[in-house]
Each structure stands twice: as structure tokens, then as C-alpha cells.
Swiss-Prot record:
Residues 1-29 form the signal peptide. Keywords: Endoplasmic reticulum, Glycoprotein, Golgi apparatus, Membrane, Secreted, Signal. It holds the Pfam family FAM198. The lineage of its organism: Eukaryota, Metazoa, Chordata, Craniata, Vertebrata. This is Golgi-associated kinase 1A.
Amino acid sequence: MASWLRRKLRGKRRPVIAFCLLMILSAMAVTRFPPQRPSAGPDPGPMEPQGVTGAPATHIRQALSSSRRQRARNMGFWRSRALPRNSILVCAEEQGHRARVDRSRESPGGDLRHPGRVRRDITLSGHPRLSTQHVVLLREDEVGDPGTKDLGHPQHGSPIQETQSEVVTLVSPLPGSDMAALPAWRATSGLTLWPHTAEGRDLLGAENRALTGGQQAEDPTLASGAHQWPGSVEKLQGSVWCDAETLLSSSRTGGQAPPWLTDHDVQMLRLLAQGEVVDKARVPAHGQVLQVGFSTEAALQDLSSPRLSQLCSQGLCGLIKRPGDLPEVLSFHVDRVLGLRRSLPAVARRFHSPLLPYRYTDGGARPVIWWAPDVQHLSDPDEDQNSLALGWLQYQALLAHSCNWPGQAPCPGIHHTEWARLALFDFLLQVHDRLDRYCCGFEPEPSDPCVEERLREKCQNPAELRLVHILVRSSDPSHLVYIDNAGNLQHPEDKLNFRLLEGIDGFPESAVKVLASGCLQNMLLKSLQMDPVFWESQGGAQGLKQVLQTLEQRGQVLLGHIQKHNLTLFRDEDP
């Protein structure tokens, strides 16, 4: 029996040995090579080893196709293949006892090193589905300054470098979120002093921008950019826009439009200064005033010329006024510098169009005012220069009631603060037509219309006094629109019309900041350089010196009035 069992076992020895060898080889294969997981996307290409000091060499396949690169730019983190089970990913700081990972990789897009990237020791072990995506998301959560990304970085050429820049922004905020380092950082990164100034808001002589003719033109009071202007008095005084030595074309301003002009302003100024005149019409009862339609380059290529009414409904019209109305151009820039944004864009221009009568093409500069398509006019012939009929006594009553909304007498629906903006604007320019066309608040010259038309005789009866040019737009009926803003810049200081300020209990903070900063003259000089025809017609900075000094002095008088009567200041967002 024993000999039979021995022979039986000897016969089975070879299969058992073979089986044991097979098991050993299988175990060696399992332990020698890491498991591979199926890819969820396209083939990422060959794997490349990453040299790791102080840790076993680990082969990690990184997948970043072109579509994933785009998603990485948009989402702000890298996507990668899953890590092998029991593997270790180390993002170590540069210390001798810690592991360092070399992330360099050759590619057509360039070098992918991340020299400025924050490094941390992160060990991912024991989880087969944990990927590098989670590592970057963890770093995102640890970023201390969420606003750093919005400051931007200089752009690079390749898509891969752009992706790198996004990741660096997420994980490399300014050290300690030190906001004091922002000015120097902006200077080195090529950012402008006024980050809200949009790309393309350059001087009128620079490249043309396409003008789209929408049914409703963009509201200048709501357009992007200028709503952030101005900052504090200290920021104004320290800015290049207040610097007396800096010209608008200086490299310090970057050749950009001033920050108080919106994108809509720049587009309309360019249209008025460069648009081709394609149609015209006289304005009844307004003498030398012509309404003209302008065409953009795109519209000129169209064989069918649009009618004047079509152009005007698209915001592509302007009013050519008399040479004596050139101060309206200055008034527009005063409005924008003060942050009021209620006047319609205006430029000076010399016309050469064969469509215009000779007196418009004789080489003299004339003001051109943008025609807003939705300004409301009453149907009453006696009140057609108003959007609502308003007398002096009614005006004083609504000021006393602090009216904001319609439906309760005597409130017409115009925001209460609108009257303060109007009073400030008219006082600085000494525009009397709106609030005091009868010249009740000052001693007029014999040549003034209120004397020639014997209007001043009505000052004895306030019930007969009417306000004129009280206009709103249908797209924004709670805000006023200023027209006919030529003003009187030769009016002596001892004859200033303080009746324009009667009943006003506060003024816009933004405008008062500009007046208090002492920067009004220098800011207006830079703003007026946007209009080369007006600038040259007035004799440049030297020719404008006297009128700008007059405006500065009137601003100081207004500040004294505010202080004397202890009047309040309101923010732009206050109704």
C-alpha cells in the first residue's frame, strides 16, 4: 500500500510544480506592473516617468487633450487620469527632507513648468479613484484672495501656457493677500491705472469701431465703465488725470479715453466726428439747426440708402448747430467729468459734404449734438420743448416733498436727486433757460433774450413762471436729459444766479469730490483733447485757460454754498 501511494504522488508531482510556477509568475506580474484603468477620453499618449526624490518611482499617465485644455481654462483646474492604487502623489515644498516632483514635459506648446505655483505635501493613499483633479480643487479652496484672478495676467502665446496661467492664478495669490502691493504688481503686469477702461476706448483718431444700429440706443447713464468714476478725492489728486504735466497722448494714460467717458460716449463721439452724412432735414423754428443722418462703413456698403427717419430711430443722427453754440461741447465734457452723465454727446466738426449748404461747409467749426431717438416731447406747441409742463411754484413744491415716484401730487415721476444734478450743472455753466428763463435771479445784460422779449417783467408773478427744456427719455423716464447747454462762461462772479440753487437740499457726492479735489481744470483739458477740432478752434490749452479757471472758481463758490447751508451729499445710486 505504501509503495502504491508513493508511485501515485510521484506521477502528480510535475502538474503540481507547473501549477506552482504559474502562480509565482502571476504574482510577479501583478506586483511588477501597476493596474491600468480604461480611459474616459481619447488616447492621452505615452506615459512619461516623473522623477521623485525620496519616494518610489511612479508612472502617472496625464491626459490633457485640446478640448480638455479648453475646459481647464474655463473651469480653472487640471483634469487627469486616476492614480494607481496605493500610489503616492507628493507636491513638496523645496526642502531637503521632502520629495520634489519634476513636472517638466516637452510639447509643441512649450515648457509646462510651474515655477510660481504653491507647493504642498499632499499624500493620496488607499483610494483607487482619487485623482489630481481633487488636488487642484483642494488648492482652490485654500486660496486666500478670490479677487486675485480678476486682476489678470499677461497673455501667452500657446493654449497650454494660457492654461498654466489660469492654474497659477488660482493657487498663487499675492503673498498674504497684501493689497498694498497691488499698484506695483499692476505696473509690472502691464495693467492700466483705471481697470474699468474697456479695450478699444482709444482716441478718436485710432481704429474705427463698428456701430450697431439698435432700435434703442444704449443709455449713457447705464453704460459700462464710467459708473465707477470718480474714486475718492485722494485718488483723484494722485491720478494721471489730475496731473497738470500729463497729456492725453502720454504713455502714462496709455492713449486711452478718460475713465469718465463710457463706451457709448466714445462710439457716439466717433460717429459724430467721422460719420458720413447721407441725409439731412431742417428743424422747424430753429434757424440754422440741421438734423443729419450718418452712415457707418457697413451701411455705406449697402446699396439701399436708409431714410433719415430710419437712421434717427437707430441712434445714427445728430444736430448741426450754429458756431456760437460751440460751448455746448465744453458743457458735455463738464457733465462727464463731474459724473452727472445727463448731457447728450457733442463734438466740434468741420463739414465738407456736398449734401450740406455752403454755410455749413465753409471751413468753420460747428457743434454736432447726438440725436437721442427716444427723447419725449409734449404735443402742445407751447410746451414742445418739454417732456412735462412744470411751473416754478410746482417745481418748488416737488422739491419740498422730495418726490421720487408719480401718482401723488405734485410728483411727476422724476427722481428727487435729478433736480440737484441739474441745479449744480446749470449753476457752474450759468445756464438760465431751464430753471430761470425769465432772469429773475440776476441782473441780465440788455442783449439777453429775457430782456429783449420782456420776459423779466413776469418775475413779479411767480405763478406765470414756466420751466423749459425739462426733458426725459422714454427708455429712462425717471432721469432728466440736458439739451441746449451752451451756458454763459463770461458771466461775472458777482452776478452769479443763485436762484438756480433755490430749494435744493443736497448735491451728488461724485461731482462734489471732483470740485473739492482741485482737479477740474486738468481733467477737462484731458477730456477736451478727445475733440481735436474743438481743441484747435479754441486755441488749445492756452486758449481754454480762462474759461476753465472760471469753472474752477464757480466750483469753489458752490462748495462754499454747500458748507454755508450745511447741505447733504448723496451717492449716485440714491434716487
